[in-house]
Curated annotation (Swiss-Prot):
Tagged with keyword Coiled coil: no
Organism: Alouatta caraya
Cytoplasmic side: 1-8
Keyword Transferase belongs to the record: yes
Top enzyme category: transferase
Chief place where the protein resides: Golgi
CDD domains, alphabetized: Fut1_Fut2_like
Gene Ontology BP, a term: lipid metabolic process
Protein known as: Galactoside alpha-(1,2)-fucosyltransferase 1
Pfam families listed in its UniProt record: Glyco_transf_11
Intervals, Lumenal compartment: 26-366
């Protein structure tokens, strides 16, 4: 009898050990998930990072007007610190902000903006990226990367944890898969939106009680481009013939459109834009030091006519609707085409009207 009892005791002891081990494992497993212990903590060298590589490229980007793929969720574990040099004017910094946000998400990194960019954009938009403190910026072992102005495959697999981007990226190929998120980041503050809508409400056509049904924002880029484009880039800015053709395009497709003109050259606009049809309103203040009033006005319109430049691009991108842009505005041998790809600059559904390059041929004659 004794040997049998001894075997029973041994089996019972082993069973208790197994049950205890299972109970302990289940307790630890449950507690780990209760406290957020995931693979990123258990394997700190291999953070749980989701790379939405499939949506960075053109085939994964929505091609129909004003649509977007669902905003990708933030990866479960973001690491590193990425930022971008704030350079250029208002539209340039919008492009830099959107590109930083998109590339950081794509590579599972935390994005921060520098104080100068916050100072330029935060008074206008409800941006959410945190600001990098100057002392952190000064002590971070940055690797620097200058971006060209279109999305490239290598930008989807950047392994640097501390990366400072630079350049003037403003291409939809970087961020169009995040269209709704970008539009949310660039939501106007209420007072700017309400002021712009108030201006539009005051516009009338014909009889005082008739309100126009369709507003077309018109941005005419002039200023320094009058010299830069022909002298440096063998290019032109939009002329009166282009603006007339663009307006006629909308007149043929929309009932009683009203053209709301803004520019950093309002005097030229008043002297050169045909107002004989009574549907053109000069509403911009042309103040380059405070561009947000004109920008807010353009984004509240239904459609857009742009000439060249990032200011017009962003106004059109945020307004939605139809967009007409100035196409082929440089000579074929322009150096500008080495840094600018039209197919990456203008959305496929936008409508291009070719520029008149004859003034450049005149300049080229001996």
């Amino acid at each position: 009898m004794w040997p049998l009892s001894h075997r029973h005791l041994c089996l019972a002891f082993l069973l208790v050990c197994v049950l205890s081990a299972i109970s302990f494992f289940l307790h630890v497993h449950q507690d780990s998930f209760r406290h957020g212990l995931g693979l990123s903590l258990l394997c700190p060298d291999r953070g749980l990072v989701t790379h939405p590589v499939a949506i960075f490229c053109l085939p994964g980007t929505p091609m129909s007007p004003n649509t977007s793929s669902p905003c990708p969720q933030h990866p479960a574990s973001l690491s590193g610190t990425w930022t971008i040099y704030p350079d250029g004017r208002f539209g340039n910094q919008m492009g830099q902000y959107a590109t930083l946000l998109a590339l950081a998400q794509l590579n599972g990194r935390r994005a921060f903006i520098l104080p100068a960019m916050h100072a330029a954009l935060a008074p206008v938009f409800r941006i959410t990226l945190p600001v990098l403190a100057p002392e952190v910026d000064g002590h971070t072992p940055w690797r620097e990367l200058r971006l060209h102005d279109w999305m490239s495959e290598e930008y989807a697999d950047l392994e640097d944890p501390f990366l400072k981007l630079s350049g003037f990226p403003c291409s939809w190929t970087f961020f169009h898969h995040l269209r709704e998120q970008i539009r949310s980041e660039f939501t106007l503050h209420d007072h700017l939106r309400e002021e712009a809508q108030s201006v539009l409400r005051r516009l009338r056509l014909g009889r005082p009680w008739d309100r126009p049904r369709t507003f077309v924002g018109v941005h005419v880029r002039r200023g320094d481009y009058l010299q830069v484009m022909p002298q440096r880039w063998k290019g032109v800015v939009g002329n009166s013939a282009y603006l007339r053709e663009a307006m006629d395009w909308f007149r043929a497709r929309h009932e009683a459109p009203v053209f709301v003109v803004t520019s950093n050259g309002m005097e030229w606009c008043r002297e050169n834009i045909d107002t004989s049809k009574g549907d053109v309103m000069f509403a911009g203040d042309g103040q380059e030091a405070s561009p947000w009033k004109d920008f807010a006005l353009l984004t509240q319109c239904n459609h857009t006519i742009m000439t060249i430049g990032t200011f017009g691009f962003w106004a059109a991108y945020l307004a939605g609707g139809d967009t007409v842009y100035l196409a082929n505005f440089t000579l074929p041998d322009s150096e500008f085409l080495k840094i600018f790809k039209p197919e990456a600059a203008f959305l496929p559904e936008w409508v291009g009207i070719n520029a008149d390059l004859s003034p450049l041929w005149t300049l080229a004659e001996p």
